[in-house]
A protein has these predicted regions:
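Short, well-formed alpha-helical segments that are part of the catalytic scaffolds
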Residues: 13-26
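A conserved acidic beta->alpha catalytic loop
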Residues: 35-44
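Glycine-rich, basic loop-to-helix element that forms the pyrophosphate-binding segment
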Residues: 53-69
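Active-site regions of enzymes building and remodeling cell-envelope glycoconjugates
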Residues: 44-54
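Short beta-strand-to-loop acidic/aromatic patch adjacent to the donor-nucleotide binding site
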Residues: 74-85
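Conserved catalytic core of nucleotide-sugar-dependent glycosyltransferases
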Residues: 87-88, 92-123
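Short hydrophobic beta-strand elements that form part
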Residues: 7-8, 78
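Cell-envelope/extracellular polymer assembly enzymes that use nucleotide-activated donors
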Residues: 3-5
Length: 123
């Protein structure tokens, strides 16, 4: 059976992290890791926390999560940031869509005001 690994990336937003973590149900994944790229410590009794030296950047934090989850034997890796909340098991939906389409990476159509049409072009 395939295993699902989840990496949560957080940086100096403990309230966001707490809400994000609480929205991810334990039955949705097999392995989980939190990578904290902020200066303030994050504690989570349900998952390991890897602390960077702080300010390494989201890319490096995601690579740390991927490396950890691969070491855990995860077949599917889902990376989330601390400002994401889940009310349904989106992870299974992503995996199903991957199997049906062959697309390995899904992007959100909207990720902040700068991605609205015209704004990113300075209009």
């Amino acid at each position: 059976m395939s295993s699902i690994g989840v990496g949560i990336i957080t940086c100096n937003r403990p309230d966001f992290f707490k809400k994000c973590r609480e929205s991810i149900k334990e039955e949705w994944y097999d392995s989980i890791v939190v990578v904290n790229d902020g200066k303030d410590p994050i504690f989570d009794s349900r998952s390991p926390v890897i602390q960077t030296s702080g300010g390494e950047g989201v890319g490096k934090a995601k690579n740390i999560a991927i490396e950890y989850l691969l070491e855990q034997g995860s077949d599917y890796i889902i990376l989330v940031e601390d400002d994401m909340l889940f009310k349904d098991n989106l992870f299974e939906q992503y995996i199903r869509a991957y199997k049906e389409t062959g697309i390995h990476h899904f992007m959100f159509a909207y990720h902040g005001p700068a991605n609205k049409a015209g704004i990113s072009r300075g209009k």
